[in-house]
Design a protein with these regions (language model features):
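Short basic helix-loop element that most often maps to the first helix and adjoining turn
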Residues: 6-19
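Residues in the recognition helix of alpha-helical DNA-binding motifs
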Residues: 9, 23, 34
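Residues in the helix-turn-helix
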Residues: 19, 30, 48
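Recognition helix of helix-turn-helix/homeodomain-like DNA-binding domains
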Residues: 26-44
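DNA major-groove recognition helix of helix-turn-helix/homeodomain DNA-binding modules
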Residues: 46-64
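Helix-turn-helix/homeodomain-like alpha-helical modules used for DNA recognition
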Residues: 61-76
């Protein structure tokens, strides 16, 4: 998951940084740090990245990692 994917995923489901932090059980500064990295969400542990990803995927976000990494909503 890239920082851009994380920002886009949040925007796609209209989730604030504070709400994502709360649901993932991490601090708001942690979410901000993840989203500010230019390439990858490498500023935090793999465990923290997984917590965030689980929340986003539970809301229907699907991460795409082809030639152009992105996000989309899963079809119901």
């Amino acid at each position: 998951m890239t920082a851009a994917q994380m920002r886009a995923a949040r925007a796609l489901i209209s989730l604030s940084q504070s709400e994502l932090a709360k649901r993932a059980g991490v601090s708001i500064p942690t979410v901000k740090r993840c989203e500010s990295d230019s390439e990858r969400v490498a500023a935090v542990s793999a465990e923290t990245q997984d917590k965030i990803r689980v929340v986003l995927e539970a809301e229907g976000v699907e991460f795409t990692n082809g030639n152009h990494p992105g996000v989309r909503l899963r079809r119901p």
